[in-house]
């Protein structure tokens, strides 16, 4: 008799995805982040659901309802901070996951990579709308500033912004629709994740060498289930340390002041995970140019497969590309820091140089380094 997990229509899918999946025997801990992202998504949906039970998407009561969750709801404070800091963990895992893909050439799985880029954009949109919901000063002004960027689009810009706002400024209509979208998008993300996995399992996983490993596969369970449990335990430990010891470490103090359209905060900035893109936006003195650079800072990932000129897939045996990759990581961290600083000397020039370097490394230096490395192979 066939085992039920191999014959039952539903169990068969789960079995082929998480149990009997043939997996390369040499994938390192950098491959843990996919499962960690899945755990983050589940955590965000669960905590978000419980928050939505007590939250009211109305400009007059939104701020008070968040305070009520923290003060009066049983364990409301921990649910709220798990949700807020869970988003930070989500983005840390996302950035590492994308970085892993860039380093080991996983972007050559085109369908998987492109769905991944769409996922990144969707998660960013969801996080942005979630940041608006507590209706604090930074929520309100971040919503005003970021949505206003669309007014840079020629001809239709102003109409588009007013259409998104549902009026002539960020108000009740904006908050209500942002709550609706913030609620529905995680389920769309879940659907995209399934498609992402579907495409990945068509080709099988990449591995650190970038060499096909079809002759050396092992079952996902028990080898990688136990490895993923270790990764998940460490991530949850870090998240709990953050939530229980310094829940506001990554937040903005301005968001503890109720939104006031008549009083602009001295320094408007988004959450830390958007600061790199925000720094690129601010480094260009022209509004439309800044918006284009902002969009390109993420969409450039979709171009990476087309810029791959190397004969080798992974960077494991390519020292020049490795150097450029770690320069890109350092540049990303520099941009994140610059985004949190006020617009004054020397931060302006540092931001401009870091922005130029960001695009230069990806569009020019990496492909050139690949060609040089190809020629070095002939020696």
Curated annotation (Swiss-Prot):
SUPFAM superfamilies, per database record: a domain/subunit of cytochrome bc1 complex (Ubiquinol-cytochrome c reductase), Transmembrane di-heme cytochromes
Annotated keywords: Electron transport, Heme, Iron, Membrane, Metal-binding, Mitochondrion, Mitochondrion inner membrane, Respiratory chain, Transmembrane, Transmembrane helix, Transport, Ubiquinone
Membrane topology, from the record: Multi-pass membrane protein
Cofactor note: Binds 2 heme b groups non-covalently.
Any one GO CC term of the record: mitochondrial inner membrane
Any one GO BP annotation for this protein: mitochondrial electron transport, ubiquinol to cytochrome c
Residues the record lists as binding heme b b562: 83, 182
CDD domains: cytochrome_b_C, Cytochrome_b_N
Transmembrane segments: 33-53, 77-98, 113-133, 178-198, 226-246, 288-308, 320-340, 347-367
GO molecular function terms noted in the UniProt entry: metal ion binding; ubiquinol-cytochrome-c reductase activity
Subcellular location: Mitochondrion inner membrane
Binding, heme b b566: 97, 196
Chain sites annotated for binding a ubiquinone: 201
Function: Component of the ubiquinol-cytochrome c reductase complex (complex III or cytochrome b-c1 complex) that is part of the mitochondrial respiratory chain. The b-c1 complex mediates electron transfer from ubiquinol to cytochrome c. Contributes to the generation of a proton gradient across the mitochondrial membrane that is then used for ATP synthesis.
Note in the entry: Heme 1 (or BL or b562) is low-potential and absorbs at about 562 nm, and heme 2 (or BH or b566) is high-potential and absorbs at about 566 nm.
Quaternary structure and interacting proteins, as annotated: The cytochrome bc1 complex contains 11 subunits: 3 respiratory subunits (MT-CYB, CYC1 and UQCRFS1), 2 core proteins (UQCRC1 and UQCRC2) and 6 low-molecular weight proteins (UQCRH/QCR6, UQCRB/QCR7, UQCRQ/QCR8, UQCR10/QCR9, UQCR11/QCR10 and a cleavage product of UQCRFS1). This cytochrome bc1 complex then forms a dimer.
Similarity comment: Belongs to the cytochrome b family.
UniProt-recorded name of the protein: Cytochrome b
Organism: Dicotyles tajacu (Collared peccary)
